[in-house]
Amino acid sequence: MATDEHATPTGTGTTETAIHGTVAPGFEAVRDAFAGNFATQGDVGASVAITVGGDLVVDLWGGTATFDGPDDDEAGVPGVEGDWQEDTIINVWSTTKTMAALCCLMLADRGELDLYEPIATYWPEFAANGKETVATRHVLSHTAGLSGWDEPLTMFDLLDHDKLVTLHAAQAPWWEPGTKSGYHAISQGYLLGEIVKRIDGRSLGTFFAEEVAGPLGADFHIGTPASCDSRVARVIPPPSPLGEEGADHDSIAYRTLANPALTADFSWRKDWRRAEIPAAGGHGNARSVALCHTPTACGGTAHGVTLLSEDGVARIFDQQIEGPDLILPLELNMGMGFGLPGPMLPVPNPRTCFWGGWGGSLAIIDVDAQISFSYVMNRMGEGTTGDLRGAGLLLAAYGAMMA
């Protein structure tokens, strides 16, 4: 692969955005689509990476990491300034969920966690208030009925794992578990994190660092250390905040998204970075996301690292729910922790799974083609689980594979 310094006009048409990195022969269309995101889709700083059969065939980055938003003198950490670099990382929001799911799948593969067993087997207090039969599979598929909290919360409560899991252990489900999906936008991570901790003894972030990121050499963090601060870019908030403004305040959607009403700039805080928020607080770039999922794409093993057996990979595709979601205005087709092919993921291969993050980040695993794909950016769009920028890059990648 050759280093690429291809320059393409940005969305303003007045400056040029240099695209850096490498592309394997035949994947030049991905580079062109990536440059096009800056030219026509308003990208500011971003990265895209693809592995095929374990080989890194696309590893591109470009734009600027600078965002001149205000700093919080007490708790804020200035974002990195200047060009988006090879090692720039950023909060990827719900793309983090794919890492949390991977940790649970690994424990299931080792026989330590039964995804169909009641959570109360591992976490006895969780059985309270009618949750005796709620299983980990329900949390992974957003069907547990615990998409939010009864008690009013602030954004600072999101930094307190123990408080949030204690509240959920005592709370009744908002709907009959297993019957419908309702996107557990923030809550999923705390629930999975507590399950992992009860079984393994380590926090989910520590488990991930020691069992996934460390062995693979992947620069992805759930609980980002201060040593990374000089490389962390700040997200550029979307035009509209996350939430259901004007919606029925008694609706499940409003109760989920407005308690608390999370704003993107809260992720600029150092206490957010340090906290383990497994549904929304992971920091990485496209290369690290793609690398973390490369073993799964290759049947469980890549680069000498085995994360899952073939049966463990197959467990992802155990469909749990398909139909309209109670929170997102979408039809969800959910397996174990990942979305499956359907309206949200129109791809050619059936053993493909995905999830994306608020504002546009995206992770795709195609086991049939052994593809691991990721797109990560700083300028957030309106979407909650990815957007057209990542989709366009994915289409270019499949086009290259089929050429």
What are these regions (language model features)?
Residues 110, 142, 171, 295-299, ...:
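Generic structural signal for alpha-helix termini and adjacent loop/cap motifs
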Residues 179-185:
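Cytochrome P450
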Residues 27, 89, 95-101, 133-136, ...:
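Short alpha-helical patches at coil-to-helix transitions and adjacent helical residues
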Residues 81-82, 86, 91-95, 99, ...:
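Active-site helix/loop module of the DD-peptidase/beta-lactamase fold
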Residues 28, 34-35, 54, 90-117, ...:
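Active-site SXXK
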Residues 171-178:
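Cytochrome P450 catalytic-domain "roof"
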Residues 27, 61, 83-84, 98, ...:
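Tryptophan-centric aromatic hotspots in well-structured domains and transmembrane helices
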Residues 2-73, 87, 180, 197-215, ...:
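Catalytic loop of the DD-peptidase/beta-lactamase superfamily, centered on the K-T-G motif
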